[in-house]
Amino acid sequence: MNIAELPLLTVPLELKAHEMARQLAAVQSTVQKGKRVYLNALAVYAVHRYLKWLQIETDLEGSDSFNQVKTALANVADLVITGIGSLECRPVLPGETTILLPEEVIENRIGYVGVQFSDRLDSVQLLGFAPTLDSSNPPQQIAVAELMPIDTLIEQITRLEEALAFLETDDPVAVQVRSEIETQSRSNIVAQFERIYRTCEDYEWRYAGGEMLAGSTAGGEFTRESADSADTDLEDLAEALLEKLAGIWREAA
């Protein structure tokens, strides 16, 4: 269903939100950057409030968007969802029909929320949600019309929670995956596997998942033969993991 057919969720922006946004904006080097940081902070705060209503724990102060140094260096509007990963909350101004995605927000995100602003800054509307992007071939923007209903964000969080919980088990597949991605963010790996599950046919899982794992575990020197063997092993592991996760997600559906 198109989001235009659904009533949008309105989130009030109280004085506290504006005070926090002003503090971040005040230390920026230009007026333009200060305005950008101000709107980003309000967008993030609105999504934080929405998730708080749903009793989903977030770490507002631990998010880059509420860090004075990081907001000075990058156009970020992230909200850390505790134990899950970072959600990007992009402001949408009146008349805009697309959400531009700065390069710095393509990777390490579990998804994107469009936050509609009006000329008054006393409230915003949550336009909808877009799940994890393919970081190897990312779009530069997301059309507002292509956003999913905001409820799908909760479904996404639940899936990622279930997948991360599986990776903590003693299942042989989980143990092997932990070994392979020891230095990588489990949240990011799980989000990419969820994307593959959602967008690829079953017969594509092996190769798409293997390629993703290969990129996450790249390093060292290989002969062609050893590299081919390693790729096959990673494809086997990716296929096994996706089959496990598919079983968990389908059972919960």
Please report, for each region that a protein language model flagged, where it lies by residue.
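Nucleic-acid endonuclease domains
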Residues: 1-83, 90-253
